[in-house]
């Protein structure tokens, strides 16, 4: 019997650039939870943004946020993995130096930005609807850094090789969308988040289900038996799913 369901958001639960979860999905999730199934959005997004998305059921869910750097269930932190601060600041400086790239730095409940363009500021605060804090210097951040997100407004395909080649031996580097690439501690991925939920509730992979579509979902798909990949996903990701779905 399935007791835990995790789903990626962008490209999976949210299709075609949608930035809100439709009411029918919320109602279905509520029915699952009422039957004793644990549901967790598993996303590169911040936890504050995730809770806004799920509205009326937000306090009933588990959360695998920041690609697994922060895991929470009903307000209790199950897992939290921060980046080495010195390394994080070096990566931030590198992102800033890239002409088409913006940086977003994740704390536990807010994300820090110093926008180069009004377009990026609007996207993060109005489109994605993140809780953001403007900073003059990223060295002023006085909490743990959980994740660094690179946003290339021309498409992350144009800059991903730079970050993969430069940082993949020191950090976990994952493409998380058409515009985004995430860097975390080497131990962080959605699969680790799934493991922490499984350990907390004493669940086996055969009791777990996950849905995903992108490279940052692979580790999560590998940790459950019922692994569903979206039909539009690239073949490298589809290899990690037992099932293919188009909703």
Functional labels for PLM-detected ranges:
Residues 36-40, 59-61, 146-147, 206-207, ...:
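Short active-site oxyanion
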Residues 50-54, 160-163, 221, 237:
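Hydrophobic packing residues within well-ordered alpha-helices of enzyme cores
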Residues 56-59, 67, 166-169, 223-224, ...:
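Short, structured coil segments at secondary-structure junctions
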Residues 3-18, 221:
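Asp-based phosphoryl-transfer active-site loop
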Residues 90, 94, 99-211, 217-220, ...:
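Conserved acidic, metal-coordinating active-site core of Asp-based
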Residues 23-119:
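Active-site phosphate-binding/coordination module
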């Amino acid at each position: 019997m399935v007791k835990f369901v995790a789903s990626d958001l962008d490209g999976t639960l949210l299709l075609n650039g949608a930035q809100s979860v439709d009411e029918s999905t919320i109602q279905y999730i509520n029915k699952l939870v009422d039957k004793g199934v644990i549901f967790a959005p598993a996303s590169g997004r911040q936890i504050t943004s995730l809770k806004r998305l799920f509205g009326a059921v937000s306090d009933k869910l588990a959360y695998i946020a920041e690609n697994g750097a922060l895991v929470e269930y009903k307000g209790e932190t199950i897992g939290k993995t921060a980046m080495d601060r010195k390394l994080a600041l070096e990566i931030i400086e590198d992102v800033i130096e890239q002409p088409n790239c913006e940086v977003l730095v994740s704390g536990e409940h807010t994300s820090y930005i110093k926008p180069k363009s009004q377009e990026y500021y609007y996207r993060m605060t109005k489109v994605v609807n993140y809780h953001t804090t403007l900073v003059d210097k990223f060295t002023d951040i006085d909490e743990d850094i959980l994740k660094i997100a690179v946003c290339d407004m021309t498409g992350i395909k144009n800059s991903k090789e730079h970050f993969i080649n430069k940082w993949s031996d020191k950090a976990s580097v994952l493409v998380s969308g058409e515009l985004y690439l995430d860097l975390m501690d080497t131990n962080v991925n959605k699969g680790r988040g799934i493991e922490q939920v499984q350990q907390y509730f004493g669940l086996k992979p055969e009791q777990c289900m996950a849905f995903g579509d992108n490279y940052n979902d692979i580790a999560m798909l590998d940790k459950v038996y019922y692994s569903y990949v979206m039909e539009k996903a690239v073949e490298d990701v589809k290899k990690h799913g037992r099932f293919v779905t188009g909703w």
